[in-house]
């Protein structure tokens, strides 16, 4: 029984080490919520809005990047800065990133949440809609990572969260376009993580 306990403890330590990108120090000590700045794309509704509210509860300053208007309930909240930004437009993302840095400072958290979907069959999906869906659901993540990851690397501190879906793994007949975009998004996120920890 003692041997199982020891094996369990060692396993737990190795799991913690792996989750901490094989760094020996405890990353939790470096995070002071009231000093953190988070970017949330698509933060004006749905999952993004819920994430914004949770970050605000922890005292994190939040920059919302969205094409929708900020909900009235959040307009007077001191912890929020709203930036109207089409995240599918790379120039808009880089311009907004500069505005965020001037207004709040360099972010330590990036939550890529913006996404769109509408049920379609493969045959009824227009090329315009398909391009828009991939621009918002996939390429916007590329642009925001290019815009904000250098700040995190410079500070040697940061988290990038990708809001994906079970659709990354399983394709529904009526949502092939959406599922394909989420599979691409998962692949991008895993590749970005691998590059980041390898120093590339």
Regions found by a protein language model. Give the residues of each.
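Active-site helix of classical SDR
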Residues: 145, 181
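Conserved NAD(P)H cofactor-binding loop of Rossmann-fold oxidoreductase domains
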Residues: 113-118
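Substrate-binding pocket helix/loop in short-chain dehydrogenase/reductase
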Residues: 121-122, 126-131
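The beta1-alpha1 cofactor-binding region of Rossmann-like NAD(H)/NADP(H)-dependent oxidoreductases
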Residues: 83-98, 127
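Canonical Rossmann dinucleotide-binding motif of NAD(H)/NADP(H)-dependent dehydrogenases/reductases
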Residues: 23-63
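Residue(s) in the substrate-gating loop at a strand-loop-helix junction
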Residues: 165
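Active-site loop-to-helix junction immediately N-terminal to the catalytic Tyr of the SDR YXXXK motif
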Residues: 125, 171-179
């Amino acid at each position: 029984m003692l041997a199982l306990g020891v094996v369990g403890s060692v396993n737990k330590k190795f799991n913690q080490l792996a989750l901490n990108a094989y760094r020996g120090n405890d990353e939790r000590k470096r995070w002071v919520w009231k000093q953190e700045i988070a970017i949330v794309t698509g933060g004006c509704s749905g999952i993004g809005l819920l994430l914004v509210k949770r970050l605000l509860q922890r005292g994190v300053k939040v920059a919302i990047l969205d094409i929708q208007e900020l909900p009235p309930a959040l307009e007077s909240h001191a912890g929020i800065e709203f930036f109207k930004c089409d995240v599918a437009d790379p120039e808009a993302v880089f311009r907004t990133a500069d505005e965020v840095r001037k207004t709040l400072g360099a972010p330590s958290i990036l939550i890529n949440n913006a996404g769109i979907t509408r049920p379609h069959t493969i045959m009824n999906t227009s090329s315009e809609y398909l391009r828009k869906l991939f621009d918002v659901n996939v390429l916007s993540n590329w642009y925001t990572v290019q815009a904000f990851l250098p700040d995190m690397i410079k500070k040697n501190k940061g988290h990038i969260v990708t809001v994906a879906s079970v659709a990354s793994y399983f394709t529904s007949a009526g949502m092939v376009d959406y599922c394909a975009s989420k599979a691409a998004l998962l692949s991008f996120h895993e590749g970005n993580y691998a590059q980041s920890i390898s120093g590339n």
